[in-house]
Amino acid sequence: MDIRQVTETIAMIEEQNFDIRTITMGISLLDCIDPDINRAAEKIYQKITTKAANLVAVGDEIAAELGIPIVNKRVSVTPISLIGAATDATDYVVLAKALDKAAKEIGVDFIGGFSALVQKGYQKGDEILINSIPRALAETDKVCSSVNIGSTKSGINMTAVADMGRIIKETANLSDMGVAKLVVFANAVEDNPFMAGAFHGVGEADVIINVGVSGPGVVKRALEKVRGQSFDVVAETVKKTAFKITRIGQLVGQMASERLGVEFGIVDLSLAPTPAVGDSVARVLEEMGLETVGTHGTTAALALLNDQVKKGGVMACNQVGGLSGAFIPVSEDEGMIAAVQNGSLNLEKLEAMTAICSVGLDMIAIPEDTPAETIAAMIADEAAIGVINMKTTAVRIIPKGKEGDMIEFGGLLGTAPVMKVNGASSVDFISRGGQIPAPIHSFKN
């Protein structure tokens, strides 16, 4: 690394809010299955606290050594519905509490995997887990939950979609922060390091390290230097910048893997914003020439950004995965918040943007009197985009307050303006239940 690259890296950290957003250890709990739920809970606690005992210390050590902030250390586990199914328990809150206790013991920020995969129907543990979510999130501090309700290969489980509309409402009623830790997916990935949607897939190694990077401020600063130039130049600039960001993620992942004695999994090539000024994906899009995010051209700008981040990142590391793209959470991005407040960004435009970005309707506050069926219909729309386009989409909706209010979450979760929701009913649509079949182009064999 020459002196110019060293000074560039220092500037990225000190002036442009570059950080490693997360080191996430994925842990399989399949060997913790037990017909007695309390014994299963104890096995889960013991395995997590043993395997991840040094995760936080190693993360802090690497951050100090390289001078690069590592914002979060997290754990993801096997979907708990698979573990709970071996028991005769009627709810899995005790397993959520075991996860929470383990997370607090090892000092991680979040633990993900209170999850179920129901894209084609319910198995024994799935419905029990889903109905346990409101209490599990209300009675724990660090547990995150996700449910996969659709996939390109399976279609969309509309019965589960309806159930999740109800569960989101119940979760919001039981706790202030619970819904911020609950994601509904289509095409969920098994190696996602980001919360709240991380879980450890059954096809993964027993224990693995995945890394998520963050650098929208770095990309914006690079684009400031090419103002007025063609999109060819913009694309090349984003690609080269993404390469630098991802290269550091690769280094951190390899170091963590070696020191913890576990396999290195992937680097997630996502641009993840924070509420801090200078760390916004929205401002990157505006730097391309948009007066404000939400105006015409926003989706095209996001498409360019997303694609070039992937192209630059793929070259920088040997294994990429996770969600890999630009995150557009409203509450976690000061530019997105401003666009909602000035009226240029609405739910319909956000939905269009999710056909491009790496997640979906993320950290969006809606009025608390929004019917469960309307929330379910939002989930169905997002799932349809993901299923048809063969990409991951998700919904993390916050039903709180009334239109125009500001909902304060604090920390990385930021502040969300409560957005207007279409008032026309979707009740008859959602009440049908059943399965929307897989699209014709999913049949590849």
UniProtKB/Swiss-Prot annotation:
Signal peptide positions on this chain: none
One Pfam family hit: DUF711
CDD domains in the record: RNR_PFL_like_DUF711
Subunit and interaction comment: Homodimer.
Recorded family membership: Belongs to the UPF0210 family.
Name of the protein in question: UPF0210 protein SP_0239
